[in-house]
Amino acid sequence: AMARLLEKGEGIDGVFASNDLMAVGAMAAIEEAGLRVPEDIKVIGFDDSVVAQTARPALTSVRQDIVALGEAAAELMIAQLRGEEVVPRILKSELVIRETA
């Protein structure tokens, strides 16, 4: 997907991927196109997984408490199964700034 975006040449200066693995894939496509991360295109992932910490350059990523996410998902699912009103929740997240943004 990143390679196709770069082929269009529409002046992309940043990418926010839906997870860290996709962000690392975007970084590879950016480098294959002869561009540099973060000098030419900044990249941010989502998960703050081990992938983000070991990527080179180290990946900036959004960290979310997966335990809290799992608990909230289970509570909402149980409420829905019981026929109770399901109220959306907003969970806290944190931007972990590293070398790619």
Residue ranges and their predicted role:
Residues A1-K8:
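Structural motif
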Residues K8-A101:
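Flexible loop/turn connectors
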